[in-house]
A protein has these predicted regions:
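Short, charged recognition helix plus adjacent turn
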Residues: 77-117, 121
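Short, conserved catalytic or interaction motifs in soluble domains
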Residues: 50
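Residues that mark the N-terminal boundary/hinge immediately upstream of a DNA-recognition element
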Residues: 19, 30, 56-59
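Short alpha-helical DNA-recognition segment
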Residues: 22-47
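DNA major-groove recognition helix of helix-turn-helix/homeodomain DNA-binding modules
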Residues: 56-73
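A short, Lys/Arg-rich alpha-helix, primarily the initiator
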Residues: 1-26
Length: 126
């Protein structure tokens, strides 16, 4: 049995992707519609939302327009999510070489990361 300690972690692109997913879902916007507004395929946008690909500044600007909010607000929510995750002991690591540089790191994604995003969005509205 493996007794090596495991840490929970995530990447900033995964946080931004989850923020974009949550904001899109709040607006009941299908992923394909946001992808079209940004000018990428749904498959490419899915990789951005899942954190497998970093969003470019141009794509962030277009997504923000489609979501009717400034890009800075999206990044502010991502920054708040990063703070909340860090407070809870989640390590934020660089996406490049994440598994080589951080053996034993268990990356948060999906619902686990979504909890921090939801909290950050609620906090940004207060």
């Amino acid at each position: 049995m493996d007794h090596q300690p495991h840490n929970l972690g995530t990447t900033y692109p995964a946080i931004v992707g989850k923020v974009l997913t949550a904001l899109r879902a709040q607006r009941n916007m299908p992923q394909k519609d946001l992808a079209q507004a940004v000018g990428v395929t749904q498959a490419n946008w899915s990789r951005i939302e899942s954190g497998h690909t970093s969003v470019t500044l141009e794509h962030l600007r277009r997504a923000a327009q489609a979501l009717d909010m400034p890009p800075a607000q999206i990044l502010a929510i991502a920054d708040q999510t990063e703070v909340e995750a860090s407070v809870q002991g989640v390590t934020i690591v660089d996406a490049k070489g994440v598994h080589d540089l951080h053996p034993g790191l268990i990356l948060l994604a999906g619902a686990a990361l979504g909890i921090f995003v939801t909290y950050a969005i609620m906090k940004s509205k207060s």
